[in-house]
C-alpha cells in the first residue's frame, strides 16, 4: 500500500511543524517522526483504526493532539486531514 496526503493535509502538517519548531527547536521534527510512525501503522493495518462516518478512519498521533483522517481507495491510503483534535471538530468534512 502507498499513502498520499491531499494538499490541505500536507499544508496542515507543514503549519503544525512550523508551530512546534517555533515553540522549541527540534519539536517539529519530533512531530514529523510521530506522523511517519502513524503513516506506517496505517499502511501495515489500514482497517485497524476507528471508523468516522461511513468510509473514513482516524489514526491518533502519539504525544501530539493530532489525528490522521484517511480513507482507503484500492491500494492507496488518502490522508484528507492532519487534524488538531482540540479545534473545530469535523472541519475537514467538505474535503470528502
What is each residue range found by the language model?
Residues 10, 36, 66, 85-86:
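Alpha-helix N-cap/helix-start and coil->helix boundary motif
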Residues 2-56, 73-76, 95-96:
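Basic, Lys/Arg-enriched alpha-helical interface segments
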Amino acid at each position: 500500500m502507498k499513502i498520499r496526503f491531499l494538499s490541505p493535509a500536507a499544508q496542515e502538517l507543514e503549519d503544525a511543524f512550523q508551530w512546534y519548531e517555533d515553540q522549541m527547536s527540534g519539536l517539529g521534527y519530533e512531530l514529523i517522526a510521530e506522523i511517519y510512525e502513524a503513516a506506517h501503522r496505517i499502511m501495515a493495518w489500514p482497517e485497524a483504526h476507528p471508523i468516522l462516518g461511513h468510509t473514513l478512519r482516524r489514526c491518533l498521533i502519539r504525544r501530539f493532539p493530532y489525528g490522521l483522517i484517511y480513507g482507503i481507495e484500492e491500494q492507496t491510503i488518502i490522508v484528507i486531514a492532519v487534524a488538531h483534535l482540540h479545534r473545530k471538530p469535523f472541519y475537514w468534512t467538505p474535503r470528502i
